[in-house]
A protein has these predicted regions:
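Histidine-centered nuclease catalytic patch
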Residues: 66-98, 104-123
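Residue-level detector of intrinsically disordered, flexible termini
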Residues: 1-2, 67
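Short, charged low-complexity linear motifs
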Residues: 2-4, 26, 100-103
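Short helix-coil boundary/hinge micro-motifs
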Residues: 2-12, 18
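Short C-terminal domain-edge/linker segments immediately following a structured domain
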Residues: 100, 108-109, 128-133
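C-terminal, charged low-complexity interaction regions
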Residues: 163-164
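Short, charged surface segments at domain edges that flank catalytic/cofactor-binding sites
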Residues: 16-66, 124-151, 155-156
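Flexible, polar/acidic helix-loop-strand segments at domain edges
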Residues: 160
Length: 164
C-alpha cells in the first residue's frame, strides 16, 4: 500500500507502484521507501516519465520459452494478455507475455492483480517485473485517454475499474 501521504488517485497509485518497480531491481532498494517516494515525486512532477514498452517487449522476445509469471522454462509457452481484452485494450504486443500452460490456463482473461493476489494468494509486491510493468503502463494509458487519472482509487487492483 502506498505511503499515507500519497494521494488516493489513479495516477498516484500507478506512479507509486511504477516507482517501486523501477527502484527495486536496479539498485537493490526493494524496501527503501526514500528512493521510492523520490521517484514517485519525480514522476508526478514530470521530471521523469515511465519508459515506453520497448524494455518489456525485448525481455519477452528474449525469453519466449520462459513463463513470465512463474519463471518455468517450457517449450510450450503461450501468449497471454496481461490486461483482459474485455477492458477495451487495443490489440498489440504491449499486452502480451509468454506463460507456461499452467499459468496460462489459470490466468485466462483475468485481471493480473486479481488473479495474482486473490486467486493465487501471492503478495502484490511479488508480481513479476515484466507483467507488472506492462500492466502499469497500460493502466496509465487507458486511464489517461478516458480522463480518469484524477479519479479516486484505493488500490492497484482498482485502476481499471475507474475507467467509464
Amino acid at each position: 500500500m502506498p505511503a499515507p501521504y500519497v494521494p488516493k488517485k489513479v495516477e498516484d497509485i500507478i506512479y507509486y507502484y511504477y516507482a517501486k518497480l523501477v527502484i527495486a531491481p536496479s539498485a537493490g532498494f526493494e524496501r527503501n521507501y526514500g528512493f521510492i517516494i523520490d521517484t514517485y515525486k519525480r514522476l508526478k512532477s514530470g521530471d521523469i516519465q515511465m519508459s515506453d514498452y520497448d524494455r518489456e517487449i525485448v525481455r519477452i522476445a528474449e525469453k519466449t520459452d520462459e513463463c513470465a509469471f512463474c519463471g518455468k522454462k517450457s517449450s510450450d509457452c503461450h501468449p497471454v494478455h496481461v490486461v483482459p481484452r474485455s477492458l477495451g485494450i487495443p490489440p498489440g504486443m504491449h499486452n502480451l507475455v509468454m506463460a507456461c500452460e499452467g499459468c496460462a490456463n489459470s490466468k485466462k482473461e483475468k485481471d493480473l492483480m486479481h488473479w495474482w493476489c486473490e486467486e493465487l494468494k501471492q503478495p502484490r509486491d511479488e508480481v513479476p517485473r515484466v507483467p507488472l510493468g506492462l500492466y502499469l503502463k497500460i493502466a496509465y494509458e487507458m486511464n489517461k485517454i478516458n480522463f480518469c487519472l484524477k479519479k479516486k482509487c484505493n488500490s492497484l487492483g482498482e485502476v481499471f475499474s475507474r475507467i467509464s
